[in-house]
Protein backbone atom coordinates (compact mmCIF):
# COMPACT_ATOMS: atom_id res chain seq x y z
CA UNK A 1 0.00 0.00 0.00
CA UNK A 2 2.64 2.57 0.99
CA UNK A 3 4.69 2.63 -2.24
CA UNK A 4 2.03 4.31 -4.41
CA UNK A 5 1.18 7.13 -1.94
CA UNK A 6 4.89 7.75 -1.38
CA UNK A 7 5.46 8.00 -5.13
CA UNK A 8 2.56 10.45 -5.48
CA UNK A 9 3.97 12.57 -2.65
CA UNK A 10 7.43 12.48 -4.26
CA UNK A 11 5.99 13.66 -7.59
CA UNK A 12 4.36 16.59 -5.77
CA UNK A 13 7.52 17.35 -3.77
CA UNK A 14 9.63 17.29 -6.94
CA UNK A 15 7.30 19.98 -8.29
CA UNK A 16 8.10 21.99 -5.14
CA UNK A 17 4.45 22.23 -4.16
CA UNK A 18 3.28 23.31 -0.71
CA UNK A 19 3.34 21.06 2.34
CA UNK A 20 -0.45 20.60 2.44
CA UNK A 21 -0.50 19.32 -1.14
CA UNK A 22 2.35 16.89 -0.48
CA UNK A 23 0.69 15.59 2.71
CA UNK A 24 -2.64 15.21 0.87
CA UNK A 25 -0.77 13.22 -1.77
CA UNK A 26 0.65 10.94 0.88
CA UNK A 27 -2.81 10.43 2.40
CA UNK A 28 -4.93 10.44 -0.76
CA UNK A 29 -5.87 6.73 -0.62
CA UNK A 30 -5.80 6.21 3.14
CA UNK A 31 -9.58 6.41 3.75
CA UNK A 32 -10.31 4.22 0.71
CA UNK A 33 -7.67 1.58 1.40
CA UNK A 34 -7.31 1.36 5.18
CA UNK A 35 -9.37 1.46 8.37
CA UNK A 36 -8.45 5.13 8.96
CA UNK A 37 -11.48 7.42 8.92
CA UNK A 38 -11.84 10.97 7.74
CA UNK A 39 -12.77 11.95 11.31
CA UNK A 40 -9.43 10.58 12.52
CA UNK A 41 -7.58 12.54 9.84
CA UNK A 42 -9.45 15.70 10.84
CA UNK A 43 -8.01 15.33 14.35
CA UNK A 44 -4.44 15.23 13.04
CA UNK A 45 -4.28 17.34 9.87
CA UNK A 46 -5.33 20.82 8.77
CA UNK A 47 -8.66 21.35 6.97
CA UNK A 48 -6.98 21.97 3.60
CA UNK A 49 -5.50 18.45 3.74
CA UNK A 50 -8.61 16.66 5.00
CA UNK A 51 -10.92 18.45 2.54
CA UNK A 52 -8.71 17.31 -0.33
CA UNK A 53 -8.52 13.74 1.01
CA UNK A 54 -12.30 13.70 1.40
CA UNK A 55 -12.74 14.73 -2.24
CA UNK A 56 -10.09 12.25 -3.38
CA UNK A 57 -11.88 9.37 -1.65
CA UNK A 58 -13.93 7.88 -4.47
CA UNK A 59 -17.43 6.83 -3.45
CA UNK A 60 -17.91 3.84 -5.77
CA UNK A 61 -21.61 4.72 -6.20
CA UNK A 62 -20.48 7.87 -8.04
CA UNK A 63 -19.44 7.59 -11.68
CA UNK A 64 -15.65 7.81 -11.94
CA UNK A 65 -15.66 10.77 -14.32
CA UNK A 66 -18.19 12.65 -12.18
CA UNK A 67 -15.88 12.02 -9.22
CA UNK A 68 -12.97 13.48 -11.22
CA UNK A 69 -15.05 16.54 -12.21
CA UNK A 70 -15.84 17.14 -8.53
CA UNK A 71 -12.11 17.45 -7.79
CA UNK A 72 -11.54 20.38 -10.15
CA UNK A 73 -12.58 23.26 -7.84
CA UNK A 74 -10.20 22.13 -5.08
CA UNK A 75 -6.66 23.06 -6.16
CA UNK A 76 -4.98 20.59 -3.80
CA UNK A 77 -7.22 17.67 -4.80
CA UNK A 78 -6.74 18.48 -8.48
CA UNK A 79 -2.92 18.52 -8.19
CA UNK A 80 -2.88 15.32 -6.15
CA UNK A 81 -5.15 13.55 -8.64
CA UNK A 82 -2.91 14.60 -11.53
CA UNK A 83 0.10 13.16 -9.69
CA UNK A 84 -1.91 10.02 -8.87
CA UNK A 85 -2.84 9.63 -12.55
CA UNK A 86 0.79 10.12 -13.57
CA UNK A 87 1.96 7.35 -11.25
CA UNK A 88 -0.94 5.05 -12.15
CA UNK A 89 -0.20 5.56 -15.85
CA UNK A 90 3.28 4.07 -15.54
CA UNK A 91 2.95 1.14 -17.95
CA UNK A 92 6.25 -0.37 -16.82
CA UNK A 93 4.79 -0.60 -13.31
CA UNK A 94 1.60 -2.20 -14.69
CA UNK A 95 3.53 -4.75 -16.74
CA UNK A 96 5.69 -5.62 -13.74
CA UNK A 97 2.50 -6.28 -11.79
CA UNK A 98 1.44 -8.77 -14.46
CA UNK A 99 -1.40 -6.74 -15.98
CA UNK A 100 -2.66 -7.74 -19.41
CA UNK A 101 -2.29 -5.50 -22.45
CA UNK A 102 -6.09 -5.17 -22.50
CA UNK A 103 -6.14 -3.94 -18.89
CA UNK A 104 -3.26 -1.55 -19.54
CA UNK A 105 -5.11 -0.12 -22.57
CA UNK A 106 -8.27 0.31 -20.48
CA UNK A 107 -6.36 2.15 -17.77
CA UNK A 108 -4.49 4.28 -20.31
CA UNK A 109 -7.79 5.45 -21.81
CA UNK A 110 -9.43 5.95 -18.41
CA UNK A 111 -6.54 7.95 -16.96
CA UNK A 112 -6.10 9.98 -20.14
CA UNK A 113 -9.75 11.01 -20.06
CA UNK A 114 -9.53 11.86 -16.35
CA UNK A 115 -6.47 14.03 -17.01
CA UNK A 116 -8.30 15.81 -19.84
CA UNK A 117 -11.22 16.53 -17.50
CA UNK A 118 -8.92 17.96 -14.82
CA UNK A 119 -7.00 20.13 -17.27
CA UNK A 120 -10.00 21.43 -19.20
CA UNK A 121 -11.30 24.93 -18.55
Please name every model-derived segment.
Residues 1-121:
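Active-site helical microenvironments for divalent-metal-assisted chemistry
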Amino acid sequence: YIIHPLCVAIILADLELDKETIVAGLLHDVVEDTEVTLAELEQAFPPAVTEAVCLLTHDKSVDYYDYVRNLKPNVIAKKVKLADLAHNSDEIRSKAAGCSEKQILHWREKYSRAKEILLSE
